[in-house]
């Protein structure tokens, strides 16, 4: 192979062309990768510590995320928890309610500041995606949730007759919208979360017959895809059902190792059980030990049974905080905080 020498003329020519590109296309349009202000991708918490660990820290900012699964599996609950975490950090959140099914009371119970949550309920898919595009372009919103892709009905389908056949309209709409939105998402640092439903393909003999709606464009543009399933119904004696156990598989992850699995409890009317997640990770990292049905911490038995252990942590917040700190240190989860961009370009630590 021929030797490549460092020629001063080449360096000068490179400097000139880089300056010309920046003048033509704006500052930051081209750069050396090592010159980037932040090489590390910032993340936001999902509200479930077990899922944050599986994702390598949380949902990546400036990326597209898809959450899909069967009905009543926890998709909207997970998205609302992400909104609540962003708002707690001082960020701005928007919810595009294409299904017209957002429950303000439930959202508030999950910790969402409904007084400051931006909500849009568009009539057509074009309107919904145009709203998303404008919110992303503003660089003033930190997370946008679209609920759901299946409800993004093209205008032509709405204006047509009920029996009309409209082939591939929604897939073409999603493909065009994502081409427009993707670049702006990276520049603005906004997380765009698409919730999606599952359908069954007909005549499939081998492999899974399940397929997400809206074509394949979202699969390519999404940096993270989460497959959420309900695996168990939680019951408590005569009180009956009080929640579900959800399992999330990271089907795709461009910023951390994929195919990891996380489980957590979703309590009806309350959302993701934070203490339940923490107890699972504390047991996994040997901060809390379990022998049979008994849970112990620092050599002392704290409760018998998982439900009682969760209740103990809820009733003893100082001990729970200490355990959480030890879990984060052992699993290198960090604080999971993220910087919210301010108007002057400064960042909040």
Swiss-Prot record:
Recorded GO CC terms: cytosol
Protein purpose: Can catalyze the hydrolysis of ATP in the presence of single-stranded DNA, the ATP-dependent uptake of single-stranded DNA by duplex DNA, and the ATP-dependent hybridization of homologous single-stranded DNAs. It interacts with LexA causing its activation and leading to its autocatalytic cleavage.
Matching PROSITE patterns: RECA_1, RECA_2, RECA_3
Alphabetical UniProt keywords: ATP-binding, Cytoplasm, DNA damage, DNA recombination, DNA repair, DNA-binding, Nucleotide-binding, SOS response
Cellular localization per UniProt: Cytoplasm
InterPro entries: AAA+_ATPase (IPR003593), DNA_recomb/repair_RecA (IPR013765), DNA_recomb/repair_RecA_CS (IPR020584), P-loop_NTPase (IPR027417), RecA-like_C (IPR049261), RecA-like_N (IPR049428), RecA_ATP-bd (IPR020588), RecA_C_sf (IPR023400)
Nucleus recorded as keyword: no
HAMAP family: RecA
Pfam families membership: RecA (PF00154), RecA_C (PF21096)
SMART domains (UniProt xref): AAA (SM00382)
Keyword DNA-binding recorded: yes
UniProt organism field: Crocosphaera subtropica (strain ATCC 51142 / BH68) (Cyanothece sp. (strain ATCC 51142))
Protein name: Protein RecA
Entry's Gene Ontology molecular function annotations: ATP binding; ATP hydrolysis activity; ATP-dependent DNA damage sensor activity; damaged DNA binding; single-stranded DNA binding
Cystine pairs: none
One record GO biological process: DNA recombination
Residues that bind ATP: 69-76
Main localization of the protein described in the UniProt heading: cytoplasm
